[in-house]
């Protein structure tokens, strides 16, 4: 009988440790997701309040977050018509032209965010009075290779 109690107690302790470990893993993932959300929100704020170079760096960073940065779509779309020149060498490691516009960087970020950007890009292409915004939206839609977008235009 004593051995049965020990076995049951051992099983109970093992189960408790398993539950605690699962909770710790879940909590760690939730904390990481919360930290990423905070960083995305900080970069979205930078899109709205920063100088052109800071906005471009924020747009690039958001694009690197892919679909997780979907909350940044509207602020990025609002930059598509911005012709301010930026220097991507200051925040990108890859070889790029020495100069590009903030609107072009925003378009590239929207492409990296992916499919959730399509409706907003179509809206810009159809209704923006700013030619540069329409040009960047058209480029982004082409880069997304979504054949369904052509039927909506």
Residue ranges and their predicted role:
Residues 2-3, 21, 27:
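Intrinsically disordered, low-complexity polyampholyte segments enriched for Lys and acidic residues
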């Amino acid at each position: 009988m004593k051995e049965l109690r020990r076995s049951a107690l051992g099983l109970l302790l093992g189960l408790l440790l398993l539950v605690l470990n699962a909770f710790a893993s879940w909590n760690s993932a939730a904390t990481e997701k919360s930290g990423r959300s905070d960083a995305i929100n900080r970069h979205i704020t930078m899109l709205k309040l920063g100088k052109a170079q800071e906005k471009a760096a924020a747009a690039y960073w958001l694009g690197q977050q892919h679909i997780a940065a979907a909350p940044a779509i509207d602020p990025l779309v609002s930059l598509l018509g911005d012709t301010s020149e930026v220097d991507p060498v200051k925040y990108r490691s890859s070889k790029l032209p020495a100069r590009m516009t903030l609107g072009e960087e925003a378009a590239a970020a929207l492409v990296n965010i992916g499919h959730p950007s399509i409706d907003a890009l179509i809206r810009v292409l159809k209704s923006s009075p700013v030619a540069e915004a329409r040009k960047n939206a058209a480029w982004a839609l082409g880069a997304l290779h979504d054949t369904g977008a052509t039927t909506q235009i």
